[in-house]
């Protein structure tokens, strides 16, 4: 669940991106898993979902420790960067540096799922 105010807009990186609605200071905890809001599926549970749900989630979910993590807010639109302005640390996505109001919020997909980054790089 995002812990900061954001909005979606056209991204110069890829399609739609997540942008900061206000300045975010360095070190701010920006996202964390919230059970009941975010959802983890075992691979067995994921495979039992209807095909349209699986196809949708392939674009917006992450593989983490052998499970599929699906989130429902703007965070699912965060784009990859080799030089992201966030870092994954102790279960939180944290501002690596101050993020300006209106700046796109980016993550390094390799911190979540190395396969995501490989798929992204093949699209270039």
Spans of features found by a protein language model:
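Conserved catalytic SET/PR domain of SAM-dependent protein methyltransferases, capturing the structural core
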Residues: 1-124
């Amino acid at each position: 669940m995002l812990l900061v105010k954001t909005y979606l807009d056209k991204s110069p990186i890829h399609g739609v991106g997540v942008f900061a609605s206000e300045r975010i200071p360095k070190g701010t905890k920006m996202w964390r898993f919230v059970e009941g809001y975010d959802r983890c599926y075992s691979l067995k549970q994921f495979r039992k979902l209807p095909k349209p749900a699986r196809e949708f989630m392939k674009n917006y979910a992450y593989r983490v420790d052998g499970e599929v993590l699906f989130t429902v807010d703007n965070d699912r639109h965060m784009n990859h960067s080799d030089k992201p302005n966030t870092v994954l640390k102790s279960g939180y996505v944290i501002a690596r540096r101050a993020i300006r109001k209106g700046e796109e919020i980016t993550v390094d997909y390799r911190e979540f799922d190395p396969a995501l980054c490989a798929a992204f790089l093949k699209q270039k």
